[in-house]
Amino acid sequence: MESLLAAGAGGIGVAAAAVGGFIAAATLAVAPPKNRRNPPPAVPGLPIIGNLHQLKEKKPHQTFTKWAEIYGPIYTIRTGASSVVVLNSTEVAKEAMVAKFSSISTRKLSKALTVLSHDKSMVATSDSGDFHKMGKRYIMLSMLGTSAQKQFRDTRDMIINNMLSTFHQLVKDDPHAPLIFRDVFKDELFRLSMIQSLGEDVSSVYVDEFGRDISKEEIYNATVTDMMMCAIEVDWRDFFPYLSWVPNKSFETRVFTTESRRTAVMRALIKQQKERIVRGEARTCYLDFLLAENTLTDEQLMMLVWEALIEAADTTLVTTEWAMYELAKNPDKQERLYQEIREVCGDEAVTEEHLPWLPYLNAVFQETLRRHSPVPLIPPRFVNEDTMLAGYDVPAGTEMVINLYGCNMNKKEWESPEEWAPERFAGGRFKVADMYKTMAFGAGRRVCAGSLQATHIACAAIARFVQEFGWRLREGDEEKVDTVQLTAYKLHPLHVHLTPRGRM
């Protein structure tokens, strides 16, 4: 999904050459129905390809936001044969996700995501129905719900303490060298994910298909990094489904090879843990819970465990890295947060119990979610039945995309949205409702299951990091705010100089 038009634009020439006899069919596929009385404004495009050529910069969320300034918060574009309604307003997006949920609840997946998710065999990609309800109930009961979070409290504390110890050691080894924040944070988040999902921090595993043991780094690459990159692969046939018979071997080879590696590694990890269970070594983890339920096929079991494994490995890292970048860039705001921590905690280390009493910390977290939306675009959905959004008629069969980046950069809803200003969220104690102002965790019945854990980890980590160290950007990094294509990942990993505060 991420490189929405690198591959799409690259395949346009091939598609155009092949569609000569299909122009009429394409026109019919995108023609608005006659009874559509008040459609959203349409962004002008070209025959056959629609607006694909205008999205070639690979950051469609930014292009969508620019179009919103011209056409308004809701408008229609065409991506090949598909008509897509784009929402760029918090108010309209919440109307779609909450009030009109029953009309707009079917996931629209690219061919790459269809393969990687084993045709929606995950909570995040499944349509609303029995499987989605079951999967969400399982992960909330055993891993991400309030009660389950209490069971993993010690593990969350451990990974934050590990990060702080690593920071102290790196500063001690070379006080003048900047450290790479992402490397340290990534390793500890993956440790947490493995303990929660598999019951232990796996250092290596034997994979039958590879004929050898693979390291933890290789496990991470096969289950997280490679999958994230493969998920953004675009098959030009997604835009021209009437040409699905045309081969695209290079795309298919990349996607199926990546999926096969992920499956081989996940099967090896699950096999290793099943052997542990046979030895009588039961543990509190997601895999043990799912096996005890005994309601899933082997494929469903593998996919749900994999989903749990990557749960904390992406958005929590993105948000925390951006928060520390902004605090290092803005020493006055960093000092305000530090003083708040001192007033509330004194010399005591910040804990999760302190979080409700740290309103400026909450403001830092919320403003980071707004300014640097971890998921700039919510994956497309189908409109199941004729409906109305923001006073416009939207017919069944239309695709809908919510541009969270555009919602949070909407000048009519946010003052000076390009500025990172935690003060816009400051005031009073932290409230659970604050988590949904930016819609970073979604809204309505499809709200992100991991929102509570993400908040616990990110807020506690940010507070401890500022409590222990003064943060300063590497010289020249003040304006490095570019992201990796569609994701919110910093294109340039955060390099910082740390100064121990001598608290402990």
UniProtKB/Swiss-Prot annotation:
Molecular function per GO: ent-kaurene oxidase activity; heme binding; iron ion binding; oxidoreductase activity, acting on paired donors, with incorporation or reduction of molecular oxygen, NAD(P)H as one donor, and incorporation of one atom of oxygen
Keywords: Heme, Iron, Membrane, Metal-binding, Monooxygenase, Oxidoreductase, Transmembrane, Transmembrane helix
Residue intervals passing through the bilayer: 3-23
Tissue specificity of this protein: Expressed in leaf blades.
Annotated GO biological process: ent-kaurene oxidation to kaurenoic acid; gibberellin biosynthetic process
One Pfam family, short name: p450
EC number per UniProt: 1.14.13.-
Any single GO CC term annotated in Swiss-Prot or TrEMBL for this entry: chloroplast outer membrane
Entry cofactors: heme
Claim: Transcription regulation is one of the keywords in the record: no
Main subcellular location: membrane
Topological category with respect to the lipid bilayer: Single-pass membrane protein
Subcellular location(s) per record: Membrane
Entries under InterPro entries matching the protein: Cyt_P450, Cyt_P450_CS, Cyt_P450_E_grp-I, Cyt_P450_sf, KO_chloroplastic
EC supergroup of this enzyme: oxidoreductase
Residue positions binding heme: C448
Protein family membership: Belongs to the cytochrome P450 family.
Function: May hydroxylate diterpenes.
This protein's name: Ent-kaurene oxidase-like 3
